[in-house]
Every structure is written in structure tokens, then in C-alpha cells.
């Protein structure tokens, strides 16, 4: 049943910062530039942030008048040319936040963005460039000698590297949560909207709501999950002061999207990784967990499958599967003071009651439900104890915690020594992982927003009937989560997550009616596309945490990697070791400063003077906790009560308070996703459309030979893949390198912030950026001697690919058909050469083509009924009269036929 609810689209998507000597004016507007908001920032305060939001929605004319008055009021001398009192400082696409070190505040703005994915018409952008502006005026600035050093440390966090945001889609939550909120009962939405208005009434915010009546649409905006928000500390100072549309929450991790073309039907495969901002850091400096249950290198990976034929969240088909990686939830670390490739693992603190593990798993129960499945990939048998220390402690912690849980909600522990199986020549690592993946997906299920297809009901599959999760009238819900870990949670973990994701992808495709069995084979276009997404996902996460790309990939464990891969693995190992030894400490300081773990304070030790950051991440070492959790009832009672459903998705008073509900007219811009996606008010280039530029299975993976099966689920031979028919070796390497670099950043040109007042200048800049397509292969100049080889290479594939060679002459039959086509076109457009108007003497010779069909040229508004002959009319009238009891007399032929029938039947 369609719901009358939609996500609220932010009305602040374009920003222009204007500057005077005393103030900054930040003007924000929506994409159509029909609604504006204004922030006023005081520049006369040396250390405090004074920001005013009048919460009024301006029109374009009102904003121009306001800026004109500000310009006139800030001129130094009346009538003096070239001395405008209002300067345009910078254009932007969003506010990252405000930060202060030892002097005044800085504002961080997003000045460049790139579209990375599209989910139901909701665009996901990657931050491409930022600008950091000091707010106080130079006349009131109080300088400090260490300010520049803090600024350099803060800017070491590269905001142009894998930071993502959206104006309408909550990236901190899963697709299951976002769609569950939209499907809430209307009665609860009405009550929540009334309660919100009673608690905080705003004359500007609620203006016009009372007169809307019952024909409106509920707009819903959910509170972000702050664990995965990376600029929460930067926005905290203005959260209670400004309108919510100014708050742009940013996640860190990975986002990639590819198009699976199934016989012309586009299906988008999206991979989103959310890196936790709690206990974040680099490889050897952040291990285990902190006192609050947050673990190092915790990443939530979600794969989303959607039918791109329908854009709406309510009418479209969407499916998702979520899994998690993270360090072993214990107090452990590795000493990097000694120059060793594998520093020894030490347990820093005894935890016999598994206190930190209890906090961690309680958080997982609340967000994901049950069962929680742990896939532990660390080594179990070693000559010298190293990784086995973690396995023994983790088993003891899980065993202790399971004593007090209900039997149906106990934590499932799966140990598997992946390194041992990899060294064995008789064991296939991926086959064993596939068995584990099947059992995991059957227990957790996955999310899909539509009921089972009718074809799956007619032809049920055994595996489908055994699938777990929660079945609801509108589809299925994923209950529970797979938590995968090794020591670093990088190479082995990424391969294991790929195999589980591949298994879940088969079920997702089956649930949408795209395949007949929930099973996918290797060496198909679909799996190759999915594998490339996961490799880019693993490389990105490995660079963020370990300082290098993946060392061991899926092909390594399949044992089909070429011999050159071994040298690349060695280089990645050396790169990771160098990064861990020399640059991780500086990166850790930058992360601590960016996330607000450390706050510079006058008179206290500086960040670089601290011997360790242990006390920054473990708050209980500096003060006593007000309350201590029970060692037996270690869970939250409300969370256990609603299992296997995740408590965050249960409709209750606590969760309803996290929602902002507002009623809109049906076609208002705040909820009109069609207007937001297509932007009819903008002139856009068809070649730069995101859906055409993204990686496609048909263009990038399917072989180009004639007569090939176009299905992306057909198993290809290694020499039949799309990559093997790209031409000679150099061209093939260039194409592969280009696709690898563009996999994590789709090709459409990034948008650079421009304002409406300088459209002429901005158009030139944007054309220069987007003039060279990133999909084009670099052209190499050839000598004259090589022209014959080049011609041969071009002509030969044309015959193989298209079955025709243009160098051969046309046959007589083809030539006559083409000549007839040309003559037909010339006769239709006869004109006098000296005049642009058709000549009168030629009008008689113009061929008038009329359709030979019996039907007229109808349209959707009017249909002309066809002519019916007399005999057909009489038959129809006799049929109508027969239904009324008026029978027609039988003819001679009918009477003789009936007599013959009676004679043969009874006589």
C-alpha cells in the first residue's frame, strides 16, 4: 500500500558567502533558486561565534533587495566607484562546520562536489574540494604562535578523499531504516507532527500548515545516527541556533554504483561503507575497543539493489543487505616502538566479565537486532602465539555473555582459520566461504520492500523457503547482522564480505524476479561487476586504515591471479609498512583534532606534547563512572524485549521523538523528488548524465563479439570477457587502468560552486572542466610507418564485431534499397532552390504517405471508432438480443446442420 510520506529535501543546496568588514552573510538557496535563507555571522568577536538565523524564507527578489541594501549601507563613501561595501567571498554547496583552535573560529565550506550514486532519485555526492575561511576581522584578531600548527594538523584530514553527503537521503542509516520510517502509519505521523508543533512552535516553520487540510503529504526527516557522522562535532555549536536545512551531515568511507543491464532493464548495484567516527584512527595506533564499546576500524557495509526503471521509493523495487567489520572487542594493542613487520599482540587490561564486549554487542542488538553472527578469521594454530591470543579471549567473552541471553537470541560464533585453508592445495577457500555465506544469509535474511513475486509462489525454491529474517506484508526485513573480523579487518575480511555479499546478491536478484534461482556463478558479468565494486571498496578502506591498498584480493584466494600480482602484493606490503611506521602518528593527531577528541585549550598541553592519546579515547580512566552496568543483565531491557527486530526501527515513543514530521502540499519542492532529480529549470547535457556515465555491465564487461548471449548471468570463458577484446595489449592496459581509477569516482564532471550573479563566467569554467570526458581513452600519436598496422587493427575487429566491413562494396540489392530511400526523402522535401518556401509546381509531385492500416491516427484524448460492415453489425445486434431472450429464426443451413447432428448422434 503506498504511503503518504516522503523524505524532506533540504532547501539549502547552493551557498554564496558575502563579506563586509563587520559581518559575513551566508546566503543559501535550493537548486531552483526560488527559496532563500540567510545567516549573519559576526566578525567583530575575536574568539566567540555569534551567528544569527532569522529563519525567514526569502524570494529571489527579496534577497536581491537585501543584498542591495547591505551593499549600500557598507560603502565607505557615497557614490565612490569600485568601493562596494559587500564583497562576494566564495560560492559553495554546503557547510561542513565551524572549528576553533586557539584564536577565532573558522568556517569550512564545500566548494566542489561530484555525484557518486543515485538511490530512488536521491543524489549522493562526494566532497571534491573545500575552503576554510577565518571569520574574525584582522583588526580584532588575537594571534597565537601555535595556531598555524593546529591549522596544518586539521587540514591533514583530506576532506576531498571519500567524504560523502546527500541533501535528501540519510546516509548514516540503512535503506531498511529509511524506508521503514516512510511506511509508518499515518495516524502516528499526525500525532507526532502535532506533538512537534506543541513542543517547539515556530511561526516561520509552521506557517500555512493549518490550511492544508487532509490532502497533503507528510515530509519526514530523521535524526542521523551520529556514530557514522564525521562532522558532528563541527556542527554541534550551531545545531540549536540555525534551521535544520543548514546542517549537512557527512559520512566517511566508500560509495560506488554500477549498472547491471538485464536485457535492457537497468538495475543499479550500490555499495556504501560507513566508517565509525568513534575510536577512529590508523592501523597500529587503534586496536581493540575503548571503554564505551566502540571498536577500531568499524565499518558498516551496505549493498543496495534497485530497479532503476521506477524512481519512487513507494512504487519502485529496492533491496539491501548490511554487514559489519570491526576489530576484536577487547582491550588489546600492538607495540610499534620496535621495527617489526608484525608487532606482538598484548592484552592491555583483564576483562573477566567481558564488560567492553557487552557494551559493543548491546549496541549491535539495538541497531541490527538478532542474531549477531561473528565470523572470526584469525589464525587458531601457530607455533608462537600471536593471533591465537585474540581467538581465545573472544571465545571466552562470547561464552560468558551467552549465559545470560535467551537461547533464541544468543551470539553465534563461527571460527575459521582462513590463512590455513589458503596455504592448503587441496582446499578451496571460496567454496568453504560460500557454505558459510549461505548459512549466514539464511539466518539474517535481507531487506526488500515488495512481497514475494507470483512466479516464486508458483515455482518455490527450497533455499528461498528456508530464508530467515522477518516477513511482513510489504516485503522482508533483515534481522541480525554478520560481524567479520581478522587482525586488521582488511584483506581476509574483504574477501569474506565479498562472498557473503555475492550470496545475498543472488537472493536480492531472485526477490526482484530477475533470476529464476537464488544462485550466481563466478565468471559472469554480474559477479565481475560486483567483484570490482568490492575491490574498490576494500582498497579505499585499506588506504584509510592501513595506509595502502589491499594486499590479497579475491583473485588471490581463487588462485587465478597472474604472476605479476605477487610483485604488486609485495609493493603494497612495503607501502603499508612505511605508512604505519612514519606517517600514522601524524594522521592519528589529525583525526583526533578533526573529530573533537582533543580540544586545544590555552594553558594545557598541546596535542603534539601528549605521549599517548589513550586517555582521550578512554574517558573512564580520568573519572569514576556514575553508574556501573550489571555483569549478568548486561543488555538494555527495551532492546531485548523487541528482538529479533532492531530496537531503532521499532515504532515507539523514543524513536518517534527522533523524527521531524511536517505536512506539505503534494507538489512542494521540499518533497518533490521528480523535480529534484530531473531539474527541468536547468539546461543539462545528455552526455554528462550520471546514468550514462556510470560503469555498466553491457559496456564494460560484456564481450563485444557477434552472437554472444547478452545475459549478465551467463558464464564467460576467460578469453570471452569484455576486457579481452579491447584490442592490443597497450590499449587493454589503458582501459583497465582507466576503469580502476574511475571505479570509486564515476565519470561525470564535478560541480564547482557558482552563483546566479555570475552565470557567464561560471559557464566557461564548467565547460573547461567537463570538455574532456573521463571515459575517453588517451589518444597516442602514431608514425607514418605504423599507419598500415593501425588500419589493419581497426578494420579487422569491425568485421568480427559487427559482421560487416565498410571497405567492401555494396551489393546491387542493398544499393537499390538505399537509392529508393534517398529518392523517397527527396520527394518529400521538394523546394525551389531560390526560395526557402516550397514551390507551387512541386507540391503536386510530393508523395503523400498514408498509413495502410484500417485504424486512424488516434491520440490519448480522442479515438475515432473503426468502420464496421453491415454483416458484422447484424451479428453483434443478434448477440445482444439473444442475451435479452429475443432469438433469431434459424436459417436453412443452420437447420440442416442441426438435423444432421441429431441423426448422427441418436439415430
Curated annotation (Swiss-Prot):
One of its GO terms (biological process) is vacuole organization. Keywords: Amyotrophic lateral sclerosis, Charcot-Marie-Tooth disease, Disease variant, Endosome, Hydrolase, Membrane, Neurodegeneration, Neuropathy. Changing residue 104 to D: In YVS; complete loss of function mutation. Changing residue 486 to S: Loss of phosphatase activity on PIKFYVE. Residues 758-770 have a biased composition (Acidic residues). Its main location: membrane. PROSITE patterns: SAC. Signal peptide: none annotated. Residues 154-547 form the SAC domain. It catalyses: a 1,2-diacyl-sn-glycero-3-phospho-(1D-myo-inositol-3,5-bisphosphate) + H2O = a 1,2-diacyl-sn-glycero-3-phospho-(1D-myo-inositol-3-phosphate) + phosphate; a 1,2-diacyl-sn-glycero-3-phospho-(1D-myo-inositol-4,5-bisphosphate) + H2O = a 1,2-diacyl-sn-glycero-3-phospho-(1D-myo-inositol 4-phosphate) + phosphate; a 1,2-diacyl-sn-glycero-3-phospho-(1D-myo-inositol-3,4,5-trisphosphate) + H2O = a 1,2-diacyl-sn-glycero-3-phospho-(1D-myo-inositol-3,4-bisphosphate) + phosphate; O-phospho-L-seryl-[protein] + H2O = L-seryl-[protein] + phosphate. One of its GO terms (cellular component) is lipid droplet. Changing residue 41 to T: In CMT4J; the mutant protein is unstable; low levels of the protein results from impaired interaction with VAC14. It is an enzyme of class 3 (hydrolase). The keyword Hydrolase applies. Pfam families: Syja_N. Its EC number is 3.1.3.-, 3.1.3.36, 3.1.3.86, 3.1.3.16. GO terms for molecular function: phosphatidylinositol-3,4,5-trisphosphate 5-phosphatase activity; phosphatidylinositol-3,5-bisphosphate 5-phosphatase activity; phosphatidylinositol-3-phosphate phosphatase activity; phosphatidylinositol-4,5-bisphosphate 5-phosphatase activity; phosphatidylinositol-4-phosphate phosphatase activity; protein serine/threonine phosphatase activity. Residues 707-788 are annotated as: Disordered. It is found in: Endosome membrane. It is linked to Charcot-Marie-Tooth disease, demyelinating, type 4J: A recessive demyelinating form of Charcot-Marie-Tooth disease, a disorder of the peripheral nervous system, characterized by progressive weakness and atrophy, initially of the peroneal muscles and later of the distal muscles of the arms. Charcot-Marie-Tooth disease is classified in two main groups on the basis of electrophysiologic properties and histopathology: primary peripheral demyelinating neuropathies (designated CMT1 when they are dominantly inherited) and primary peripheral axonal neuropathies (CMT2). Amyotrophic lateral sclerosis 11: A neurodegenerative disorder affecting upper motor neurons in the brain and lower motor neurons in the brain stem and spinal cord, resulting in fatal paralysis. Sensory abnormalities are absent. The pathologic hallmarks of the disease include pallor of the corticospinal tract due to loss of motor neurons, presence of ubiquitin-positive inclusions within surviving motor neurons, and deposition of pathologic aggregates. The etiology of amyotrophic lateral sclerosis is likely to be multifactorial, involving both genetic and environmental factors. Component of the PI(3,5)P2 regulatory complex/PAS complex, at least composed of PIKFYVE, FIG4 and VAC14. VAC14 nucleates the assembly of the complex and serves as a scaffold by pentamerizing into a star-shaped structure, which can bind a single copy each of PIKFYVE and FIG4 and coordinates their activities. Dual specificity phosphatase component of the PI(3,5)P2 regulatory complex which regulates both the synthesis and turnover of phosphatidylinositol 3,5-bisphosphate (PtdIns(3,5)P2). Catalyzes the dephosphorylation of phosphatidylinositol 3,5-bisphosphate (PtdIns(3,5)P2) to form phosphatidylinositol 3-phosphate. Has serine-protein phosphatase activity acting on PIKfyve to stimulate its lipid kinase activity, its catalytically activity being required for maximal PI(3,5)P2 production. This is Polyphosphoinositide phosphatase.
